[in-house]
Design a protein with these regions (language model features):
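N-terminal regions that are enriched for targeting/export leaders
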Residues: 1-100, 175-179
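Aromatic-residue-lined binding/catalytic grooves and analogous aromatic/hydrophobic interfacial grooves
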Residues: 188-271
Length: 271
């Protein structure tokens, strides 16, 4: 681990305002070069993780991640044959991630892009569920009214409850949770007569009967819905990744080099 010798170059990126437009960075046609560059960097890195090179640790981590993602996904959905039969070193892995909450279409687009890129490049796609973050709100603002006189209302999906990581956040009011789909559909009916929530929320209610964890319930039902739309990704919570042997090795190295890590981190933040 060595300090950065050249400053980072920053570019201002803005989400497009046109309907149906997308911001993709790096562009689709630059992905192959980025993959090749990443592999070269990993192979050339001389960092030693207590007797294990970075390339060896990365290979071990990919294998462990894939095995755990297959096991986790298989607990609530059918696992794609390609992923289930992938080699132990996992080959190419494409990862994305987000908190297990109800998010906007711009975030959801990322999941479809992840699946598309994995298929195109013969990789396995894994969506990392960031369950170490806390739940920011127990309700969402839903538009209603009419085109001429729109109005928004906050629709709760559960009681407020304590501020804890998603990993520990339980469903507190199952009746309130079960009714969220109908209440949301009623609120938005003047704008969208047949909203997607009517099809999606029964999946969330069904998963809620299998688990008392709110984040797990929302993420698994969303993933099930994506699979109906042709997305063949795997998923795994970050909390599960943190239990892997390779993660422990990586963490031990960071702790052993904590002073140097802090120096490099602060230099990069300052840039």
């Amino acid at each position: 681990m060595t300090p950065r010798t050249s400053p980072l170059a920053y570019r201002r990126l803005r989400a497009p305002r046109e309907d149906g437009a997308a911001l993709v960075e790096p562009p689709w046609d630059e992905i192959p070069a980025a993959l090749a560059r990443n592999r070269r960097l990993r192979q050339s890195c001389q960092i030693d993780f207590h007797g294990v090179s970075l390339a060896e640790l990365a290979r071990e981590a990919r294998g462990e991640l894939l095995a755990e993602a297959v096991r986790y996904t298989a607990s609530y959905a059918e696992v794609p044959h390609r992923a289930a039969s992938a080699p132990a070193d996992a080959g190419l892995l494409f990862l994305a991630g987000h908190q297990p909450q109800l998010f906007h279409p711009g975030v959801w687009f990322k999941n479809f892009a992840l699946g598309h890129l994995a298929r195109k490049h013969g990789a396995t796609a894994v969506n990392l569920i960031i369950d170490s973050d806390t739940m920011k709100s127990h309700s969402i603002r839903v538009p209603g009214g009419s085109i001429g006189r729109p109005r928004a209302a906050a629709i709760p999906l559960d009681d407020a409850g304590p501020v804890v990581p998603f990993e520990e956040r339980q469903i507190l009011d199952r009746s309130l949770f079960a009714a969220f789909g109908d209440r949301t559909a009623e609120q938005i009916a003047g704008l969208i007569p047949d909203p997607l929530v009517r099809e999606y929320w029964p999946l969330a209610v069904a998963r809620g009967q299998e688990t008392d964890n709110l984040g797990v319930c929302l993420a698994q039902s969303r993933h099930q819905f994506e699979r109906r739309l042709g997305v063949t990704t795997l998923e795994i919570p970050q909390s599960h990744v943190c239990q892997l042997r390779s993660f422990a090795r990586f963490t031990a190295r960071l702790l052993a080099e904590s002073e140097r890590l802090a120096t490099v981190y602060n230099e990069v933040v300052h840039e």
